[in-house]
């Protein structure tokens, strides 16, 4: 809140927040997100990989507050980028130069990239309950694969056989539990 109120009329700020902040459904976190959207002062959000800071395992996101941005907002999910390395007793995630540049270019150019970034309007954010999580806006892709009747029948037989085995094991476990319970005595 202090940062928002300290900004000049067209000021900018970058704030590191716990990733839970960008999706919290109530409380001060949501109120701040609502304020940023209603006042149209959000440049974008980058969700970073876990362990990006070696001293904490907390997942963080970077909020880019931009009082001059009245148009679209870029949301980036960089959580799957980077490589985990051992740093003393801690593990940390390190981004390659190319990954860093990809994040910078995607953000600056407001580019939409499948499973990495989305460019959304303030109204889109309102419609998603003020969530700043890029994943909330990704298109769900379903791939259909054509199979023959024989392939279908074989898959169904496999599923049916597996189910039979599981039912049999379940019955055996049920019988064993009943047997154990019957053997319990009060002393």
State where each predicted segment sits.
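A conserved structural/catalytic subdomain of Rossmann-like adenosyl-cofactor enzymes
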Residues: 1-187
